[in-house]
């Protein structure tokens, strides 16, 4: 009885390994939209005052989030992962 169970277990392992089952890669959804550009209603000096305040508090993750929001309004915003609309000079 044990030999039969071991034989079926070995056969199952030998046949299961070469099957080569791989997970299907997930395709990107063509209907997804890029993230919306965040809104920064304050001035540049307000931004730097907030940076200095957060530095005194040691709140560096908040500085990164705020900087991402602030700099998304400039042409380099597309490098931050935001779609920046074309702006005429």
UniProtKB/Swiss-Prot annotation:
Residues 1-21 form the signal peptide. Ear specific. The gene is Otos. InterPro entries: Otospiralin. The keyword Transcription regulation does not apply. It holds the Pfam family OTOS. GO terms for biological process: sensory perception of sound. GO terms for cellular component: extracellular region. It comes from the Eukaryota. Keywords: Secreted, Signal. The keyword Signal applies. Belongs to the otospiralin family. May be essential for the survival of the neurosensory epithelium of the inner ear. This is Otospiralin. It is found in: Secreted. Its main location: secreted.
């Amino acid at each position: 009885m044990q030999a039969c169970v071991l034989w079926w277990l070995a056969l199952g392992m030998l046949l299961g390994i070469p099957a080569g089952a791989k997970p299907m890669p997930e395709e990107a959804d063509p209907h997804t939209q890029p993230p919306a550009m965040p809104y920064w209603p304050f001035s540049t000096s307000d931004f730097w005052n907030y940076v200095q305040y957060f530095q005194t508090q040691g709140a560096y993750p908040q500085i990164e989030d705020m900087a991402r929001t602030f700099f998304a309004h400039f042409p380099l915003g597309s490098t931050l992962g935001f779609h920046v609309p074309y702006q005429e000079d």
